[in-house]
Amino acid sequence: MKIASRIVLVIALIGLFISQIVVAQLPAISTSFATPSPKAVAVEPLPLEVYCPGAFVEVGGESGIELGQIDRIGEASIYPFLGSGNFIVDPGLKTTAGTRAVVTGDNQSTALLSVIQAQGISRERATGFMASPCSQPVFSGWFISGAAALGQETVMLIANPSETETLVSLEFLVPGGKILKQVSLAAGQTEVLPVSSIIFQQPVFALRFETSGVPVSVAMQQRATAGLSTRGVDLQLPSLEPAVENLITGLSVRSEGFEKPVLRLFNPGEIPTEAVISAVSSNNVVVLRQLVEPESFAEVQLDLIDGDYLLRVESAVPLLSGVRNTILQPALDFSWLTPASEFNDLTLPVPNYKTRLHVANFGLAALILNLEIKTGSNVEYQSFEIASLSQFSLLLSGDSIRINSASKFTAALEVIDVPGYAVINPRENQNFGDALSVTVR
């Protein structure tokens, strides 16, 4: 048996040796690849589009008792800034039902297109001022400022400016639970939805929405009353996503002793968290702490002396936040301030009302701020230094303003004029696209 195994092993070794000799004598075969040829491909961004939500919506007629009556009242003024681009769809200077602005251009930012809508309201059941940026349609978003109870009316303005139908899912987050609602929108359709048809006697709620495929415009209109007296109106666009750091700019306290600003917090997470709230003005600093339970709200009255404040809300768990602020003069009105986006460069049109610019520096070092204010063909340049955790305010006069800095800043426009009060919280306008280098083998 051992002899047979040895014979098989010797035969295998001889075969392996012979195969190596044969392979060594075969001609070598080489494989060559073509020289890579880089191709430059230009990918242009889509036309930049923003949407203005339109004029004030009156529910129930002027008397408030006409069941099912929903009307747009008057017109909202449109203030467009157009940079080095061309309008595909011109928004015009007035709108009732809402309007689009669509432009082509290379510089995809507010330097290409920036639009604001504004409207003063004077009705038997509603007085005040509404203003907001006209923003890009979005696939999803949040609102913190919901209120649907006695003396508090909320109306959702939902528009589908696309050429495709879509389904919008609304999730109303109320203390102790949630209420779901779906709205189907045809291409180009606008839906006006009084929240009272869905929820009632909920003085506090947040809202999350999401679409089934195409971006939409969603705005929240609010009206406040006390008995037969009007207490103001407001128009808000979606807030930023819940975050562990919320930065709020342009809180002007002008009603000390009447109605304190109220900070609302919502914790969408599953664990409790403590919010550290810092309110800073030129002559006052207040630091507060507030526990926010999971899937719950907390409201904090900010006992602040009159002045201009920036607000920072920090937490270990992402929170949604906003401040409801009231002014007394020149008209009793309110506005919701929500977290601000950070910019290095921002261009805004200036509404034809008494408008102040607030710019805040939440960074650790001072920043240099450069302003370019245009009035017709005239341009005025100004520069300022803003210390760390400080805010700069300037009364504006002109058609548009460009704000630029090497460091990150936040900004807000505040209107306090005869019709009332509004805070305009800008957002970036941008579609992505650039030149690509593609290597083809």
Which residues does each PLM region occupy?
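Hydrophobic, ordered structural segments
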Residues: 93-128, 157, 161-163, 189-230, ...
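Long, internal scaffold/assembly segments composed of regular secondary structure
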Residues: 239-307, 312-314
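Short beta-strand/loop motifs in extracellular/secreted proteins, especially
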Residues: 74-77, 111, 154, 164-169, ...
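Intrinsically disordered, low-complexity Pro/Gly/Ser/Thr-rich segments with frequent PxxP/GP/PP motifs
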Residues: 81-98, 175-206, 283-310, 376-400
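A general "mature secreted/periplasmic domain" signal
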Residues: 82-86, 91-101, 106-111, 116-145, ...
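Conserved functional hotspot residues at active sites or interaction interfaces
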Residues: 2-64, 115-159, 216-268, 319-365, ...
